Amino acid sequence: MANVSKKVSWSGRDRDDEEGAPLLRRTGQPDEETPLLNGAGPGARQSHSALFRIGQMNNVELDDELLDPEVDPPHTFPKEIPHNEKLLSLKYESLDYDNSENQLFLEEERRINHTAFRTVEIKRWVICALIGILTGLVACFIDIVVENLAGLKYRVIKDNIDKFTEKGGLSFSLLLWATLNSAFVLVGSVIVAFIEPVAAGSGIPQIKCFLNGVKIPHVVRLKTLVIKVSGVILSVVGGLAVGKEGPMIHSGSVIAAGISQGRSTSLKRDFKIFEYFRRDTEKRDFVSAGAAAGVSAAFGAPVGGVLFSLEEGASFWNQFLTWRIFFASMISTFTLNFVLSIYHGNMWDLSSPGLINFGRFDSEKMAYTIHEIPVFIAMGVVGGILGAVFNALNYWLTMFRIRYIHRPCLQVIEAMLVAAVTATVAFVLIYSSRDCQPLQGSSMSYPLQLFCADGEYNSMAAAFFNTPEKSVVSLFHDPPGSYNPMTLGLFTLVYFFLACWTYGLTVSAGVFIPSLLIGAAWGRLFGISMSYLTGAAIWADPGKYALMGAAAQLGGIVRMTLSLTVIMMEATSNVTYGFPIMLVLMTAKIVGDVFIEGLYDMHIQLQSVPFLHWEAPVTSHSLTAREVMSTPVTCLRRREKVGIIVDVLSDTASNHNGFPVVEDVGDTQPARLQGLILRSQLIVLLKHKVFVERSNMGLVQRRLRLKDFRDAYPRFPPIQSIHVSQDERECTMDLSEFMNPSPYTVPQEASLPRVFKLFRALGLRHLVVVDNHNQVVGLVTRKDLARYRLGKGGLEELSLAQT
């Protein structure tokens, strides 16, 4: 522990020497004492009010599975919320990615014959096909609505600008532009801030956390999908520096989570299909497929979608899952391609593989030479530095928002302010620019003439007066001479800060396209410089360097290498640039990691989520399970009184949602581990009143099936909603049939990296720590492991907080 820099000590182990373990008194009979074996030592017991304390914290904010959201007390909003990035929130619960192999589960698995097994496998493939189809259709809907609304907006503004350019009074055009932008963003931010805040942003950090095993409330609900789709349409049409591609990953994940369950808890509709997949383990795999399908629909990159899900999302992987994810990705991009081709009148052409099509790069005209490799590496360095600056600025901006802009009304006002400022800055730059280019050969959809001569257009408007996707394609493919260096330099500088300010607003939006647009702008500027230095050599094409700059900037911000390389290759339909794109992305990641972590990881950290990386901190071998585990542990007996179980579940201090089950022995003998049972299982048992009247009787006649637990999943009722009479409190509950009789355990002397590897690789929620006699001495949960991380000064232990 010498190398551990402790910030605040919250672990219950620090109080072991200070507190004794008082007795738990039986509810309703104060003169009797009922032993509640806590496993902290031979015969150890503790009071009901002190069960499972985490340090000195007595109150823990419960997740939505514990509290009824309809009866939660109203939130109050202080003027400032103190926030420290060295915190780990207790409000997040873990998902059960390890199946509880109790008697019910094993009996069902034994009944599955070869035919039933094949049926389950076929259902998996059918679900993946449905995920791909629906994700593709949602992407089509977003694209068509954005194209029509944005086209209408830009036509109205263009006509207004053309009108007032001749007669004067362009300030009215500015007012119209800012008003239209603010109106769209107002609606988009209101529905996010007041209806479903988890729909804000791209959703990629939240999906990463879900696949990592963290339960993010409402992240894969139908309402979230509706708000996400509506919000991203309004954000893009509102002219913000955002893209619609990132949120497709979140949308695909929500679709996958819903389809795989065969019901909608939001709509209270159960279609009685796919019931076998109603558990976290199965849902996780389908959400991985949904994330990949979202990438595939966004960029027309099915292989890139699979690699994105592997690199950024899925924490657990196997060969069969790879095939199903690839299948969902291919179906998604084909559905999008087919529907958009019909919409554009080219039914048999299939020319729209993704929401954004970078266009084909001519390999012969734009081939690279060996002496350009150092130039590409230099561009990667620039992208890494600019990405680090972007992330650092966004970090401090997000900290400011957490502390001061936490009221929904303030969040809406900020979003409208950013929309108005974006329109104003764009108008001022377009108005001030005298960069006029010939209209002939231009790909601009809404060319603005302003003060240019007839037959010319303002090139600054080509970057600002368009959707970001079309602006990226223009920078890639417009012929040399379409932009002058001053225009590109000003656009890069201004759009960089606008995109940084915009990311983190309470709107549904992504950072993929803004990053590509910034990089394409300074990359094209880089290409113009190379062309000037080499005397307009044929290989110094600005479009090629715009592509490399876009890859460098995006890689410097999000720090993805493998998946981004393939996505860029598939989106450009050109394998030639695979090697230079990989070099650029790797260089950008290496350089950026020197200064600050990637944008998604940074926001996960700012939200204090107990996210587990692939490996434990490299300097953590000096720590053992004894030092990181939570103690004392609330244990239950095989045959436990209903009143005790109700009291344990009602006690907010015992909020680990899992309880070791120990053998029922005499008070003087040690309690050995027999199994583990989850809070959700106990809730279902109490709801169905699986009691016996006297402790010497067997189970009641009514036998629970695994279906009863699946029907309650995933929104288990809160303990407060289950009525247990005084007579029922005196009954006994036999946990033998429902507990997991073979939970994973580790000895006290196991090192932290070994505990971490076991916990992380198996997707555990609880890991029981036992002594040499198999007595429970502690419990390791996700938060116990996540609070150790490698800081600049060595190994740090994060503080635990309620929010």
Swiss-Prot record:
Keyword annotations of the record: Antiport, ATP-binding, CBS domain, Chloride, Ion transport, Lysosome, Membrane, Nucleotide-binding, Phosphoprotein, Repeat, Transmembrane, Transmembrane helix, Transport
CBS domain sequence ranges: 629-693, 739-797
Cytoplasmic side stretches: 1-124, 596-803
Compartmental location: Lysosome membrane
Location of Phosphoserine modifications: 9, 799
Expression sites (tissue/organ): Brain, testis, muscle and kidney.
GO BP terms: response to pH; transepithelial chloride transport
GO molecular function: ATP binding; chloride transmembrane transporter activity; chloride:proton antiporter activity
Family stated for the protein in its record: Belongs to the chloride channel (TC 2.A.49) family. ClC-7/CLCN7 subfamily.
PANTHER family: CHLORIDE CHANNEL PROTEIN CLC FAMILY MEMBER (PTHR11689), H(+)_CL(-) EXCHANGE TRANSPORTER 7 (PTHR11689:SF136)
Protein name as annotated: H(+)/Cl(-) exchange transporter 7
Lineage: Eukaryota, Metazoa, Chordata, Craniata, Vertebrata
GN (gene name): Clcn7
